[in-house]
Amino acid sequence: MAYLLTTLSLVLSILLSALIIPRILVVAYRKKLFDIPNERKVHDGIIPRLGGISFVPTILFSLSFVTGLRYLIGFEIAENRLHFIIPEFFFLICGLTLLYLSGIKDDLVGLRYRTKFFIQILAASMFPLAGLWINNLYGLAGIHELSPYIGIPLTILMTVFIINAINLIDGIDGLASGLSIIALSVLGSLYLYYSQWVYAMFAFSALGTLLPFFYYNVFGKADRCTKIFMGDTGSLTLGYMLAFLTISYATVNPQIHPYFEGAIIVAFAPLIVPAFDVFRVMLIRARNHKPLFIADRNHIHHKCLDAGLTCKKAVVCILGLACVFCILNMALINTINNN
């Protein structure tokens, strides 16, 4: 039954997203809400950037509906797990709301990057408030248990880092959504394996929301008014949800899932490509004494395009690289010592 309900959350999100995105396109074209091309952006023509508005409502509706259905059919969540799950998801919704509203403002009228950064820190602080923070490095660099004085700031830092990694890599069609689809598939499958049904339903609800968007983003045509971008509303909330799922999986909590060596590596493996890219770009900007949050053309997709690849070939190469990292990490986790 749990697998059926998880599948239902996926299907429901796909249907809702496929229903909502065309309506967003209609409104965007009527109100002339477009992403205008410039020297840094690689797209041609005027394209709406409000696709991300559909993400949070669709995911929350699907997750809430299926969770309510679980209780109606008598498939309740264990009391000892509810004690941890309820505050985590309530504070998650608080953080999502902050990023969702700031993303909408940024997509419509613009928002200073300092303000966005402050809101990201505020949203990231919701996780420790819920008792969710990185409390163990599983032997990475010889470190196991972490003090709250180290783990809580590290959690906030990693959350902001992941949010910006997804936001900054959203430069060509299908890249941010494609990397997120891979990450959500991996994390959702891991939660299914450990019978963490609520987290799995959340991951697959998010996955289902992205699939129709990916189609419109990659295969839509600007001249036919069927192409759309996720905008900051989408990339910020998507990064936040991925941070939540990743940190939840990496956190040691025997009430949620069993401890096993290498959990932190497996959890962060799907995000290696965007994380490495944003880390490299930030180093370049710092070395050149440029503002860290001012956009440029140093990202991995820009390098692929400068090398002569088309947008679609660049996306295929980068997504393929992300898949290779995930497979290698999972295949070698039991043979390589974290220490």
Provide a role label for each language-model segment.
Residues 2-32, 59-72, 77, 81-97, ...:
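Alpha-helical transmembrane segments
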Residues 94-101, 119-130, 154-164, 180-186:
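Membrane-embedded alpha-helical core segments of multi-pass
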Residues 36-50, 226-231:
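Juxtamembrane helix-capping/reentrant segments at transmembrane boundaries
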Residues 48-68, 125-129:
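A generic, lipid-embedded transmembrane alpha helix
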Residues 62-79, 100-111, 129-141, 250:
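Transmembrane alpha-helix boundary signature
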Residues 80-82, 86-122, 127:
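Hydrophobic alpha-helical hairpins/lids featuring a short glycine-rich hinge
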Residues 45-48, 81-90, 142-152, 264-267:
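Short aromatic-rich membrane-water interface segments that cap or initiate transmembrane helices
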